[in-house]
């Protein structure tokens, strides 16, 4: 058993070196057309280093087994099978390989296809808009929203109450209170309780109201009659004064002065004397 352990320990470092060499050769196969000379020189140097390490490890003296049996061979074959299965299922690439693959993927792009340059054209004729004009639409939107809110808040009932309040101010103090009471009732206040009066007292109140109304009517009629009489006296005096006043061009035949011939008024010397005398009398 001790001999088998020694064989396994001796075979492990050599097998690991061989596997590393195989993996590196697999990744190095198949050179692309766009590889540069620097990359090729790097690969050659790495190959030389790997070969030197493998040769050094192979040159080291290994402890030879006394009598290799079937058990040792089976253990070695099973070990290599496990390694192969692990490599096939999940091949773990070394840290150096991704850098090489990225370099390979970048070099063909530089050689075969160039990046497209993007050019922006700014014409001199177009005037750049100031920031104030850009801010105006936002301000206009806010104003429109404020107007909409004000329109929505407008209420017909409030407007009606304000108009009613303004109309009450035109009346006297006595009537203002009555109208204010009616407005309060309209808004939902409780109306005052009805006052109950005896039937006989109510009839007396109605009679007093009627008598007061009749007296007011009589006084108004008397004042109207007195005014009418004054107007009639003035109108009669005016008529009399108009009749007594002499008129030169009156419609009567006796008062007519001169004669008309072919549309012209012809005055005699007697007519001229009458006209002059009437002016002196005035």
UniProtKB/Swiss-Prot annotation:
The modification Phosphoserine is found at residues 67, 75, 268. Its main location: nucleus. Residues 27-98, 121-143, 208-254 are annotated as: Disordered. It is found in: Chromosome; Nucleus, Nucleolus. Residues 48-59, 131-143, 208-226 have a biased composition (Basic and acidic residues). The modification N6-acetyllysine is found at residue 173. Keywords: Acetylation, Chromosome, Nucleus, Phosphoprotein. GO terms for biological process: ribosomal small subunit biogenesis. GO terms for cellular component: chromosome; nucleolus; small-subunit processome. InterPro entries: FSAF1-like (IPR027973), SSU_Processome_Comp (IPR052852). Residues 89-98 have a biased composition (Low complexity). Part of the small subunit (SSU) processome, first precursor of the small eukaryotic ribosomal subunit. During the assembly of the SSU processome in the nucleolus, many ribosome biogenesis factors, an RNA chaperone and ribosomal proteins associate with the nascent pre-rRNA and work in concert to generate RNA folding, modifications, rearrangements and cleavage as well as targeted degradation of pre-ribosomal RNA by the RNA exosome. Prevents helicase DHX37 to be recruited before post-A1 state. This is 40S small subunit processome assembly factor 1. It comes from Rattus norvegicus (Rat). The gene is Fsaf1.
């Amino acid at each position: 058993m001790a001999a088998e352990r020694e064989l396994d320990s001796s075979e492990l470092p050599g097998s690991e070196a061989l596997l590393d060499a195989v993996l590196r050769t697999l990744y190095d196969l198949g050179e692309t057309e766009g590889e540069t000379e620097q990359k090729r020189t790097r690969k050659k140097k790495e190959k030389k280093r790997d070969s030197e390490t493998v040769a050094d490890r192979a040159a080291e003296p290994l402890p030879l087994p006394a009598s290799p049996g079937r058990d040792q061979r089976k253990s070695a074959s099973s070990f290599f099978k496990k390694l192969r299965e692990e490599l096939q299922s999940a091949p773990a690439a070394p840290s150096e390989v991704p850098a090489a693959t990225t370099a390979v993927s970048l070099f063909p792009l530089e050689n075969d296809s160039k990046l497209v340059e993007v050019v922006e054209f700014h014409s001199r004729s177009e005037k750049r808009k100031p920031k104030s004009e850009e801010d105006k639409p936002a301000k206009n939107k806010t104003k429109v929203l404020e107007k909409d809110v004000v329109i929505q808040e407008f209420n017909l009932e409030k407007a009606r109450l304000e108009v009613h309040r303004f109309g009450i101010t035109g009346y006297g103090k006595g009537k203002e209170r009555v109208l204010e009471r009616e407005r309060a009732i309209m808004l939902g206040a409780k109306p005052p309780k009805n006052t109950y009066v005896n039937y006989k007292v109510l009839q007396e109140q109605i009679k007093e109201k009627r008598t007061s109304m009749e007296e007011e009517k009589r006084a108004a009629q008397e004042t109207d009659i007195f005014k009418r009489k004054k107007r009639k006296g003035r109108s009669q005096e005016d008529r009399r004064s108009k009749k007594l006043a002499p008129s030169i061009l009156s419609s009567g035949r006796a008062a007519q002065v001169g004669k008309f011939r072919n549309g012209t008024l012809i005055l005699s010397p007697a007519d001229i004397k009458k006209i002059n005398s009437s002016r002196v009398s005035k």
